[in-house]
Curated annotation (Swiss-Prot):
It comes from Nicotiana tabacum. This is L-aspartate oxidase 2-a, chloroplastic. Keywords: Alkaloid metabolism, Chloroplast, FAD, Flavoprotein, Oxidoreductase, Plastid, Pyridine nucleotide biosynthesis, Transit peptide. Its cofactor is FAD. Its EC number is 1.4.3.16. The keyword Chloroplast applies. The gene is AO-2A. GO terms for cellular component: chloroplast. Disruption phenotype: Reduced alkaloids and nicotin levels associated with a lower putrescine production. Occasionally, an early senescence and a lower viability of the older leaves is observed. The lineage of its organism: Eukaryota, Viridiplantae, Streptophyta, Embryophyta, Tracheophyta. Involved in the biosynthesis of pyridine alkaloid natural products, leading mainly to the production of anabasine, anatabine, nicotine and nornicotine, effective deterrents against herbivores with antiparasitic and pesticide properties (neurotoxins); nornicotine serves as the precursor in the synthesis of the carcinogen compound N'-nitrosonornicotine (NNN). Catalyzes the oxidation of L-aspartate to iminoaspartate.
Length: 644
């Protein structure tokens, strides 16, 4: 069996075959380089988990030189050598997954937390609704599992679903023990909210600012820990990898200090990628500005396996600014109106105050997000309107203000009282259900590289994420990645000659400020063009012709942009925030389009008018294998892999 490889252009290439045990079933390639899993009788997780284990089973440390001065055991403090830092663990991202992992592994070695902006600026900090887990005696793990699988359009990995739903309550208790404060009812127990797709109340929350409270508690603990070193305003560029036969080994990451423009090389025994999603491939997203798909793109360039990128979740209810009495200035990210508003009885109306959700689904406003987003999209297109209305004003004022203080304050700031008026809402890009393929311990096919959070594809979400399962997944997988990471550190070593194995990226100072400013301006224009293409052609409802047109236009735009850069003195090893974000956005956009073109059915978040029905034989994950071909600057590492 040959592996299917997706390049930036989405073409199929073949490389050295990977052989499987005969019991694994027979994999098959679909169009556009996407390998869609296994025969129906083989569980989704069985093949994937075994693939990752087989790929990692014969670990051998790369041997390039025999006269290294190596460091065995753990590093007692942060070691540095010029612009190189040495750590036992490197963590990319400062959201719930990265911070929770850092606090655990810091008991066993030194940790670098590398974060692109301020430490709190993560998707976690913007999460409103809560964390789903079974705490109510009337609820059960089986019920939570069933809700997750139904919402995921039966593409979920059942083993992963069971693990997450079973371990979730204990992970939340750990957060509480660390100082996170959640809402409690009059009986003294945790107040449990209900959201769309859930059959029971099981959402643990802190009003409508749950993520902010979790981030606060975790950061407070991180800043107090002597073994954790936080590098803020450090933008991860590319992984440092070597190749030993068919094995890819990660030795750390290069990052640029976006305030000083110094490139720092982080050499580590283990790297956890927890960098979040890629919402900014679209013009309107609830994600913060840092969510430009950096981790997914870096992992793809480092030859990690990527999965299920066609499943982009559009949150049904982002605040529609143009419907507010006092329209705010342009935002960098859309303001989220949490799922819990509908869970608490919020009703969706069109602008004629006609309730429409019962026409689309018997669960009405409590249907899963993909159903609600498509229903709103259909209403807007049929009626030629730009937003719909979400009304919670029929509920007691005190209840509304106590449950949704953040939303109430934001709307009131712009002249709208949600206790008396409906909220204008519109779908916006929210969450990537696909990402870097991970096993049950967060392991990837790249040795020494683990993933957790939105950047990972664990199989939990399938074709559509159930509300409030994202923070839960991040907690569970951050914790599950700890022990294998510690085991890896204990048998690994840091070599202080390793820093010289790869050429160093450089800031583009030699091209001068005038030219650099021109490059940045053009890059920002290209970014808007890409976002426009993605929304127009790769949005909530898709078609083969529009996806094909998007693929063609994206590749043309990428070539035009790269040509512009190099005509203005840019070199392949140069790095800067805007340019590196842009190449990552191009990479992620291509992954989404290639994956979408390969799925010839409508399932969950992927709805195409050319294949409008679910096809049971296609209930398989989409897998993008790494490409050896470097067709563009965006698709290759800035430094070549060191071959052992």
């Amino acid at each position: 069996m040959a592996t299917g490889i997706a390049s930036g252009s989405g073409q199929l290439h073949l490389r050295k075959p990977v052989y499987w045990r005969s019991s694994y079933g027979k994999a098959h390639c679909h169009s556009n380089a996407i390998l869609n899993g296994m025969q129906n009788q083989i569980p989704w997780s069985y093949w994937v988990s075994k693939f990752l284990r087989v790929h990692r089973s014969n670990y051998s440390q790369c041997q390039v030189k025999t006269n290294w001065k190596s460091h065995t055991g753990t590093i007692n403090s942060c070691q540095r050598d010029g612009s190189t830092r040495y750590f036992d663990f490197a963590v990319i991202g400062s959201g719930i997954a990265g911070l929770r992992y850092a606090l655990e592994v810091a008991k066993h070695g030194t940790v670098a937390v590398i974060t692109k902006a301020e430490p709190h600026e993560s998707n976690t900090n913007y999460a409103q609704g809560g964390v789903s887990a079974v705490f109510c005696p009337m609820d059960s793990v089986e019920s939570h599992m069933q809700d997750t699988i139904v919402a995921g359009a039966y593409l979920c990995d059942e083993e992963t679903v069971r693990v997450v739903c079973t371990e979730g309550p204990e992970r939340i208790r750990e957060l509480i023990a660390m100082g996170a404060s959640f809402d409690h009812g009059e009986d003294g127990n945790l107040h449990l909210a209900r959201e769309g797709g859930h059959s029971h109340r099981r959402i643990v929350h802190a009003a409508d600012m749950t993520g902010r409270e979790i981030e606060r508690a975790l950061l407070e603990a991180v800043f107090k820990h002597p073994n954790i070193h936080v590098f803020q305003h450090h933008f991860a560029i590319d992984f440092l990898t070597t190749q030993d036969g068919s094995d890819i080994i990660c030795h750390g990451v290069d990052a640029i200090n976006t305030e000083t423009q110094e490139v720092i090389r982080f050499i580590s025994k283990v790297t956890l990628l927890a960098s979040g999603g890629a919402g900014h491939i679209y013009p309107s997203t609830t994600n913060p500005p840092v969510a430009t798909g950096d981790g997914m793109a870096m992992a793809h360039r480092a030859q990690a396996v990527i999965s299920n990128m066609e499943f982009v979740q559009f949150h049904p209810t982002a605040l529609a600014d143009e419907g507010l009495p006092n329209r705010p200035s342009a935002r960098e990210n859309a303001f989220l109106i949490t799922e819990a508003v509908r869970g608490d009885g919020g009703i969706l109306y069109n602008l004629d105050m006609e309730r429409f959700m019962p026409m689309y689904d018997k669960r009405a406003e409590l249907a899963p997000r993909d159903v609600v987003a498509r229903s709103i999209d259909d209403q807007l297109k049929k009626r030629g309107e730009k937003y719909v209305l979400l009304d919670i004003s029929h509920k007691p004022r005190e209840k509304v203000l106590s449950h949704f203080p953040n939303i109430a304050a934001e709307c009131l700031r712009h002249g709208l009282d949600i206790t008396q008026q409906p909220i204008p809402v519109v779908p916006a890009a929210h969450y990537m259900c696909g990402g870097v393929r991970a096993g049950l311990e967060g392991e990837t096919n790249v040795q020494g590289l683990y993933v957790a959070g939105e950047v990972a594809c664990t199989g939990l979400h399938g074709a559509n994420r159930l509300a409030s399962n994202s923070l839960l997944e991040a907690l569970v997988f951050a914790r599950r990645a700890v022990q294998p990471s510690i085991d890896h550190v204990n048998v690994s070593r840091i070599d202080h000659c390793a820093s010289s194995w790869w050429p160093r990226p450089v800031a583009p100072v030699v091209i001068g400020d005038t030219v650099l400013n021109k490059v940045i301006r053009r890059t920002r224009e290209v970014r808007k063009e890409l976002q426009s293409i993605m929304w127009e052609y790769v949005g909530i409802v898709r078609s083969t012709s529009r996806l094909t047109a998007a693929e063609k236009r994206i590749n043309e735009l990428e070539l035009e942009w790269e040509t512009y850069l190099f005509q203005h003195g840019w070199e392949p090893t140069m790095v800067g925030l805007e340019a590196c974000e842009m190449r990552n956005l191009f990479c992620c956009a291509n992954l989404v389009v290639s994956s979408a073109l390969s799925r010839h059915e409508s399932r969950g978040l992927h709805y195409t008018i050319d294949f409008p029905h679910v096809v049971e034989s296609k209930r398989l994950p989409t897998i993008i294998f790494p490409s050896q071909r470097n067709s563009s600057w965006s698709s290759r590492q800035l430094h070549r892999q060191q071959i052992c």
